[in-house]
Amino acid sequence: FPTRRSSDLGARNFQAVFWNVAYYDKYYFNSLFEHFVFPDGSKPDWGSLSWLQKRFMKWFNEERTRTVLTFPVETMALLTKDGDVLDKEYGDFTAEMYAEGHSFFTYMSDNADSLSSCCRLRNEIQDNGFSYTLGAGGVSTGSKSVLTINLNRCIQHAVKSGILYPFFLEEVVDLVHKVQLAYNENLKLLQAKGMLPLFDAGYINMSRQYLTIGVNGLVEAAQFMGIDINDNPKYEAFVQEILGMIEKYNKKYRTKEVLFNCEMIPAENVGVKHAKWDKEAGFQTYRECYNSYFYIVEDKSLNIVDKFRLHGHRYIEHLTGGSALHMNLEEHLSKEQYRQLLRVAATEGCNYFTFNIPNTVCNKCHHIDKRYLHECPECHSENVDYLTRVIGYMKRISNFSQARQKEADLRYYAPVR
């Protein structure tokens, strides 16, 4: 099934179906399904689910050594308390799977009010106005529209025009919300005309779909303002100011029927387009593809803990649509090292992350190795390609767009010492 679902389909312009799998620890499972009852009166059984989760994860990890499988994107959901995971068994199992070379995301929360899937996508189950936009775990939420603000261009335009950038940015944010509301009215009109059959059939609930305000160019905007891109008070204040403003307007325009969230978008294509358009317009761009993280992907000065900190609670608290940390490493760590990094993530409040170690694919004999190698260990050919994450999902670097291939070549993969 995963193999077939990862195949290209003509109905999606020859792209694979984007789908997700969520795993739960015992406490997460109990919080979500403790009072759930099936129509026949039976209840979900943790023991059988835990067995199935572990079996599927082990099998899928092995399957990825046989063929290139982009999907599903997997997420391990862990509840945390006092700087560590509550379920020590699943904390150890998560570290074990990372050490065995498996590629998946981990989502951490101190309460089971949310689920995550994909690269930076979360559902909040409680009605508190926070949600990633793809949906997971049977909670029928998602995004019906994403409008992205190019922060670098907005701030540079304001400064060059002699305007205080917070005033100009506030105008842009307000306008984007009004455009989203207009789009929402158009959707309602289409549904009234019977043109949205999936909504009518109940597969998608209009009132639970979010209007997403995307952000891109945050790092580049900070660089333009002369701010160092590392964990420092000036950068923290800048991030809080920008994202806090968007969250304020999300709350202002929110109603019982209209929900907003803010997301640092993956920007697989638009990160390249923004940089290209800005360069042509005479703005400083700093790189050919704008970052989708709170750090510069090519920066060699930041260590692993620095990056967890930059994606920790002090920086992401206003990102109600989320942002994932991609921890790029040259090689896999030990189970004990990964287990310690789970504690670091819990302590720093980095709630969504993955470890990204390029997998080697031989173009001659098609052998797949979970390690980052320059020669095939089977046939010793140097004609190799690499599987890594373009954004949230894994694919061959040779299948990236040309601009993304250049960006991938610049990424810094931290050596393990």
Language model regions located:
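Conserved catalytic cores of very large enzyme subunits
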Residues: 1-207, 228, 232-377, 381-386
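Generic structural "secondary-structure junction" signal
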Residues: 3, 151, 156, 208, ...
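Well-ordered alpha-helical scaffold segments within catalytic/enzyme domains
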Residues: 220-228
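Long, charge-rich boundary regions
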Residues: 363, 378-417
